[in-house]
Amino acid sequence: MVENMSDHSTRRNGKASAESPQNTEHEVLASVLRLRDDALQVLLWQRAREPHLHRWSLPGGRLADDEDVETSIRRQLAEKVDVRHLTHVEQLGVFSAPDRHPSSRVVASAFLGLVPSDVDPELPSDTRWHAVDELPATAFDHEDIALASRERLRAKLSYTNIGFALVPHEFTISTLRRTYTAALGYQVAPTNLQRVLARRGVLEPTGRSLPAGPAGGRPPALFRFTCRDLRITDPFAVLRPPNAPS
């Protein structure tokens, strides 16, 4: 029996065509966090096109051929949402679920970015800060990425000096306590926090203080972090809520 080679070739080519992979696109996204009004907030903007038109999403975009991922996300934050003053940026992870984008194959390199509480960038009209605990409906898997960035921050508050990236250069212990409380999601005792950070060598007094309040009393002392670059200070430490089992 002689097989019809043209039919076999057609079937083979048809199968190959049906199984040929899509071109994979690469995007960069940033979950930029800050502390304001005693809440941890994330920066979101509204999509201007389908899919997920008008849904809130993390800022970012496609990776250019001549950029590495961190250069790309810093550029896109500056150009698209006018966020230029980031005290800390680190890669959060790669999000590559095949169905994360409804119409194409898109792999995302996501970053955690931090903005200090005394910096208030002038945002475009389609961009706002949202409380991480009260996120609106978001596009794609961006809620998962935002929540992952919160967990990364919480973990690093335990064993690094990353708190420097959330506060002004000088601050009171009360401000620092509110920052850690909002970021960690539970109450933090100011005296314990001061003692832990001082023991690790990351916190020092400036010798200055704020003016006393209307009720009088001792003027609040000002402190600062000894280093404003990320440092691992206690690799095995885990901060826990009060009365939590160890």
Spans of model-derived segments:
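Active-site segment of metal-dependent pyrophosphate-handling enzymes
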Residues: 24-28, 41, 70-74, 78-122, ...
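Short histidine-centered catalytic/ligand-binding loop motif
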Residues: 58-66, 165-166
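Short helix-coil junctions and helix-kink-helix linkers
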Residues: 178-187
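N-terminal strand-loop-strand
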Residues: 17-56
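Long, intrinsically disordered, low-complexity Ser/Thr/Pro-rich regulatory/activation regions
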Residues: 205-246
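NUDIX/MutT-family hydrolases
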Residues: 110-112, 121-158, 168-174, 179, ...
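Actinobacteria-biased recognition of intrinsically disordered, low-complexity terminal regions
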Residues: 1-23, 34, 231-246
